[in-house]
Amino acid sequence: MAPKKTNGFMIFVNEWRKGRNISIAQAVSHCGDIWKNMSAQQKGPYNGFAKDANVSARAKVEPLDCHGRPLSAVERENCEAAEREMNMKRNIERIVLEGKAQHDLENTKFIFAAFNYFTKAIGNDIYMPAEFAACKFSLRSGRGPVYSSHINPGQLIFGQASDAQHHTSTTHQLPLPPKAMGESNMGSLYVNIVKYLRDCQGAGNPLVVFTTAELMPVVSGCFRYLQSDSDEVGEQIHVYDILYLFYVLKKEVMDIADLPHANINKCITDNFFFNDFFEYYSNIACQFHEDNDRGKYCTHSMVSRWCYTFCDYMCGDLAIKPLAGKHMPPVQEQKFCVTNPDKSMCGNTSYNSVSSWHSDVKQEPDSDYTPEDHSVFSANLTATEEFPSLSGRRPKPTHRHPPPQKGAWNVPAAKRSARDFDDAFNMTR
């Protein structure tokens, strides 16, 4: 049943009842004569209020999601996010295709960047940075010099000490503020980072850095945190997905090399990237993380490993000779040493080496031991004594023991008789 509409008379009745201890029925009977004697001009405001109330009642209440947000706002945010992602992919494809059109794709420069953070502010996407690293990369030159810095933001966000301690202890293990290491002037650090990015990108080009999808909100939030303490109006820094760059660049590299690439899809390239074959290499992280065995979480190590992964997957297609420290990690130093046995234990004993294809036996001159070469099989396959477990088994006995006698209780019920039961209870002495 549709709800009753509000009319001007009831608006007048409710207004007249205010301050009077009277029921609605009494008010209606009393106000009826007054309403009849009122002019159209006097009734106009009450009729207008009633019309507005009816319009508001007919308006639908917007549905909400489980977090109490209007669905229209959620859909609008999703559309904006999808549009941003589409624009990002188009820009990545444009950068790669421009290098391919100039026949200089192997020299196209990309900047990889990563941030470590202490904690994240509640209610927004601001992250408190702890460490930053960035490097310039190209397939021909490999990894360029790495710009890295530890960051000391001064004080943690109020109420976030526990979260910061938990996150830090499970990842990079950098000391918490105010005992943090590194640069403490956020404005100066931001200016230096922008200057470094501008020198790498060149004048007139937008500032674009590449990082993983997981670190994209972290990198954007840390840049906003640093920019908030800078007095200068900084340029906008675009943060793009390195995984999509990895996929597009691989496709174009194989196309240039005239290699079949129809079976290359983003799942394959993502899987290769996430394998992170250089994760446990040493001497590619900062000194702090090398000493504390946390190179996996070091930003210096992250950007270096990304460069090595790109080179490992694509340089072979373009016949680019890999160089240690550029296209692959530097030569690993041995962390162990091999020492000879104590000469005092050996004395002046000399040994004659007796070598064979699979063995290397040493014999002392004064010993009666004669080395034998056991690497050659010389047994006679027809001799039973050579294989006692197979052909030298004991013969099976020919006689069999008689089966044990069964009592009346072991005889099936259909074959039992009364005599069987009588014999079963007879006990021999």
UniProtKB/Swiss-Prot annotation:
Residues 2-65 bind DNA. The keyword DNA-binding applies. Keywords: Cytoplasm, Developmental protein, Differentiation, DNA-binding, Meiosis, Nucleus, Oogenesis, Repressor, RNA-mediated gene silencing, Transcription, Transcription regulation. It is found in: Cytoplasm; Nucleus. GO terms for cellular component: cytoplasm; nucleus; P granule; perinuclear region of cytoplasm. Residues 393-403 have a biased composition (Basic residues). One of its GO terms (biological process) is piRNA processing. Pfam families: Maelstrom. SUPFAM superfamilies: HMG-box. Disulfide bonds: none annotated. Residues 383-429 are annotated as: Disordered. The keyword Nucleus applies. Its main location: cytoplasm. InterPro entries: HMG_box_dom_sf (IPR036910), Maelstrom (IPR024970), Protein_maelstrom (IPR039259). Gene3D superfamilies: High mobility group box domain. Involved both in the piRNA and miRNA metabolic processes. As a component of the meiotic nuage, plays a central role during oogenesis by repressing transposable elements and preventing their mobilization, which is essential for the germline integrity. Repression of transposable elements is mediated via the piRNA metabolic process, which mediates the repression of transposable elements during meiosis by forming complexes composed of piRNAs and Piwi proteins and governs the repression of transposons. Belongs to the maelstrom family. This is Protein maelstrom.
